[in-house]
Regions:
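Beta-strand-rich domains and repeat architectures in extracellular enzymes and scaffolds
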Residues: 38-62
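Residue-level detector of Asp-centered blade-edge/turn motifs that repeat once per structural unit
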Residues: 50-53, 95-98, 146-149, 201-204, ...
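Conserved beta-propeller blade signature
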Residues: 54-57, 100-103, 151-154, 205-208, ...
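Hydrophobic/aromatic beta-strand positions that recur at structurally equivalent sites within the blades
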Residues: 65-68, 114-116, 155, 164-167, ...
Length: 333
């Protein structure tokens, strides 16, 4: 009788284990956030930019790297053009249609834009003329961002102005900014800024983080641009923002994961947060990656989301679908 009982116990255990294994084989990502890749940048990531299916990242040491759409990092070095450390707020990277890499060195960097041409492996410097503000001092060129195929936008911290760089023509012109160190709305030179560290473009509109805790919208108005403050004096540091194809604004703030901006209430709402997020990639086999989800940088292209925190780079393909699945499973636990 004891032998029969033991036999049923073993059979039950077998089918229980088999059921768990079958459940895993049916959906190996169950309860985990499915991501395309999790890659180490081997240095602190300060900013990212997308070109075609490739992710470019600017590191602090100095280094600009590239990861392809599948997470291959076998050839990541783009340039080590000088020994200047990028460990500054506002250091940025952007690309032209031809694949030329433009970058700036942030708040404490020189008053220049740098251009790296992969075909020649040469770096050239573009001088930005000084226009002292009322609070001139720090030189930095911040938040260089591709505006369209012909031009970039950036923030000149020294003059407290936003400028346009027409890279095909080699000309730089002022867009807006009074030069005063304050947050005030208006058009052209009637608007004022404290310090723009990140920009994101949606159509012809630009969304910026000003003073590290305010979100502002810049939109064309006639021959000039108008700025409107959407969110002011958020209690935590806002690290970055991105806009999806539907115009939804996603924000990453210190220790708060990913937030969404609600235009009806003008408030940030939780989207994906948590002290630890369990990530699973096609490479991770039976295991998963448990990460401290304090995001520094975010970018969106089409249905894909790209994140960076500390030295880690992440791509989430079909991010809305995958995050919705993950949140539903998390609620059921």
């Amino acid at each position: 009788m004891k032998k029969i009982g033991l036999l049923f116990l073993l059979i039950g255990t077998f089918f229980s284990c088999q059921k768990k294994e079958d459940s895993y084989l049916e959906d190996p990502y169950k309860g985990k956030l499915k991501v395309t890749y999790v890659e180490e940048a081997k240095g602190w990531v300060k900013n990212i930019a997308l070109h075609n299916e490739d992710l470019y990242f600017i590191r602090q040491d100095p280094f600009i790297g590239k990861i392809d759409s599948k997470g291959n990092t076998s050839s990541v070095t783009v340039t080590k053009s000088d020994n200047f450390n990028f460990n500054n707020d506002g250091s940025s990277v952007a690309l032209s249609d031809s694949g030329d890499v433009y970058y700036t060195k942030g708040l404490l960097g020189p008053h220049k834009i740098f251009k790296y041409t992969p075909s020649t492996q040469q770096t050239t410097e573009i001088e930005v003329n000084y226009t002292p503000s009322y609070f001139g001092g720090r030189e930095g060129i911040l938040a260089l961002t591709r505006y369209n195929s012909n031009e970039f936008m950036f923030f000149d911290f020294y003059s407290k102005t936003i400028k346009r760089y027409f890279h095909n023509l080699g000309t730089i012109v002022d867009v807006m900014g009074s030069g005063r160190d304050e947050i005030s709305d208006g058009t052209g030179i009637n608007a004022s800024f404290r310090g723009i560290f990140q920009m994101a473009v949606f159509g012809k509109d630009i969304y910026v983080i000003d003073g590290k805790n305010s979100i502002r919208k810049i939109e064309p108005e006639g021959t000039s641009f108008k700025v409107t403050t959407l969110l002011k004096n958020y209690p935590e540091t806002i690290n970055d923002l991105a806009i999806d194809d539907d115009g939804v604004i996603y924000v990453v703030a210190h220790n708060q994961g990913i937030l969404k901006f609600n235009p009806t209430t003008n408030k940030l709402e939780d989207y994906l947060s948590g002290k630890y997020i369990e990530l699973k990639t096609p490479k991770s086999g039976l295991g998963y990656i448990d990460v401290d989800f304090d995001v520094d940088v975010i970018s969106i292209k089409g249905k894909d989301m790209y994140l960076a925190f500390s030295t880690t780079l992440i791509k989430i393909a079909n991010f809305k679908e995958e995050i919705a699945k993950y949140l539903l499973e998390r609620e059921r636990k």
